[in-house]
């Protein structure tokens, strides 16, 4: 306000700095000038922050039957889909990472891995979901049908015939 004349307001705003996603800040100088050319200025900063973590759905555990080769196709597809988890962020997209290193080898080509899937936005805010990939073997081994064998007594217990039959 000015006691003698009207005041014209101006500012030097050009754009927000784009720190991450839809955030940023700008320091603006506001100037009031009266009809006689007298001016007074004041500066202030306008800031948009993103401190909100991405919204994430839970990753799903997956159990597959052992394929004898490590189930790499199923494992890689599960990892690539972030265990089925999805994420969104109000200010930016997300980048996914996970901490998978290796399957534990419980027996043969089976095992499991507990994996943390993390969605991180452009400002470094992160949300995580944990799930387990398991390879199980529930298939019983197959063996040929055992054949009965009858031999003529040799008086010594037929060790050669017994050994051959057991092999």
Language-model features: where?
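Proline-threonine-serine-rich low-complexity tracts
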Residues: 1-167
């Amino acid at each position: 306000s000015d006691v003698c004349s009207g005041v014209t307001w101006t500012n030097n705003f050009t754009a927000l700095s784009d720190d991450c996603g839809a955030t940023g800040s700008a320091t603006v100088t506001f100037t009031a000038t009266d009809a006689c050319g007298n001016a007074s200025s004041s500066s202030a900063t306008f800031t948009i922050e993103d401190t909100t973590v991405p919204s994430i759905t839970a990753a799903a555990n997956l159990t597959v039957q052992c394929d004898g080769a490590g189930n790499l196709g199923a494992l890689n597809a599960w990892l690539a889909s972030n265990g089925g988890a999805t994420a969104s962020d109000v200010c930016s997209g997300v980048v996914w990472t996970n901490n998978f290193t290796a399957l534990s080898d419980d027996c043969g080509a089976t095992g499991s891995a507990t994996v943390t899937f993390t969605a991180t936005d452009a400002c470094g805010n992160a949300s995580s979901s944990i799930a387990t990939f398991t390879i199980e073997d529930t298939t019983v081994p197959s063996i040929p049908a055992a054949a009965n064998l009858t031999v003529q007594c040799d008086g010594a217990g037929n060790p050669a015939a017994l050994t051959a039959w057991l092999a």
